[in-house]
């Protein structure tokens, strides 16, 4: 088998699959008459009404031509496209008084089935397929199939009904063919180019991935293939109906041509895209090389290498982790052999050759406004977000574990997730699914629930292939032969057609080696041509994770924390998975994690000549995992999973500060308030309190106040510091006083913090990263920005504070004040901080930062020196936005009709609140 350490789960699959595909009931509660197609409310549902969820803005994503006309005339959106927006938004203002009995004001019920009298539509997608779709009062589909195949057919039909155009966008994006779908434009070409550098599969190769599942996974693989094929048939059944019924056809197709039938290969395209965005990690070795070279230029070879290690924080003992006190060593190198390191001569230089980003004339044809809107939305796709709070039975008021969790996938119109409730003799799950995939990826089963946050484990390496000439002559700078294990072998060359530009066919030419896709060419070893290749462990296996997702929804396979972990172990993408049932909570970090030779530096490129090949993959027993932790809870907000589970080469934020600390603090606060026994509402309060907090105000600010205590500051600066102290004492929130307010409470402090944070960072680190202030070269090559602010560079993603310089700044300030630091900066770095005198000059540097921030804020606020009236900083002035509008959550349109912005909250897009007071009989 390709995957190590998983065969122990396969043994139990055959009997379980035989049970679920034979047509008999998976649970005795289905009754003596066999599986029922009726959506009986809470049948085989052990949550007893204590499972809830929300997904703004609404389930319905279909806008037909008549509805568009109505919207343009009256502003009225289609039914159920916005009915979850207000409950989601209003939690920010209602959470302080929240109780279990009022959760229903902010969340929908996630019970199986539909209450009597709440079915608004009943659909029979095909007279030949035994499946029925029931729509509830929020238009959420509850799909009941007589067989697993029938269920999959119904899921395809329902997903097409709610998200057909979005699914079309995703399949073309995942296949690198947006240009042929949305029309020619430079932006389309660029996105196709970038996607083909990640997953350049021909239709035959994509189909081969699916066809290989039975060989790899036996009966479970055969079931997956059957369900994928029937899912596609369900999509096509809807397309057939929509082509003859204008009320079923998304209006976007009047602009881009009628929808074309789906194939199983399209599912691979969507799966690869979603997994590549949310479930990948690593691949930053070339960028790391650029930072290393910069630091060595400033500090010398040895000093630069030491500084690089300091800033990389691969295993900082102060990093907050989800598993506490138990180590899971991964990527801990021994003595690194310098000969294995392959750094380009100029790692900052653009790569040469390879598929061109855009073709000459790509701008000759103006893109459609609708197509451009879609592209702009896709360019702001989020990555690596999501949070989870899971509390064990010992801290639950009723003795049953609690969970408040979900993915942060940004905000789209229609939403990039959809809700569904799926039932067949062998499958029972409700929750969220990525349209184009079919299964419930995040949700609840009969007596358990699960969710995920992106983990970012190191699945991808960058290698340098040494170019050669098979005839022994001169080597071309962009040659397509390379050395591997002593031989000069050819690359595989593939051509991907992608529409036409100015009447000429547009083709993307892709080159592949034994390691992966060629990203381009450069030089190393003093001018020798090399090709840069990304080696991704999940390459050509993008659909394999369906085995794990399928298992999550199969009651015969998932019936306990351990059996759920077994399913999670079959997900190759890198996610932090969290689980809850009536007795247990559990955590498992999935990913097809390569095992590398011990003499390789995992943070830098390696040679592809054959001497540093992967040694297999991390077995399940060595993945981070735990059931019922000693601390009584799990929380995850994309932080480090466990001690010694190394930060991937692309992760620089795993130092002493991470946003998960806001969740930890609030969970512990709820424990203290309620004598260690909390409710679902208490846990929601913990989550929502953190959702409006400013991480910089909670971490950098107290250290800064300590650092400048007793220093003589101007009167205006002292007024600023007083406002900041008051704000910090009240929780450092960025929140409106009421839903109708136009400015933040304590707006002066929010403006001060936003202006001051980058000033403090630069005061400390400019001597190293801006060469004493003469340039910004070091910052330009650093793989992480100062602060991941809510504005997100104009993307308005909602998620914020996911990695930044808070940890570095806290370390430097604590070292300046003599406060203990678990893993301090070494002397080679501290000698460069703040000024020529190193750390000893940080006092005057901080004074200057405070004064510069004060002066900038006076200017931003029209010359006012009355700190209490400030409502702006330099950024809000530059954009012309108020601070709440600057932070606000924006819904990016993936269709014709959008959604309004809402006030900022740093919480999951799709969120579940669950507890199970009972469990099925053993």
Please identify what each model-predicted range represents.
Residues 2-29:
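Secretory targeting and sorting signals
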Residues 29-698, 713, 726-922:
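C-terminal/peripheral segments of proteins
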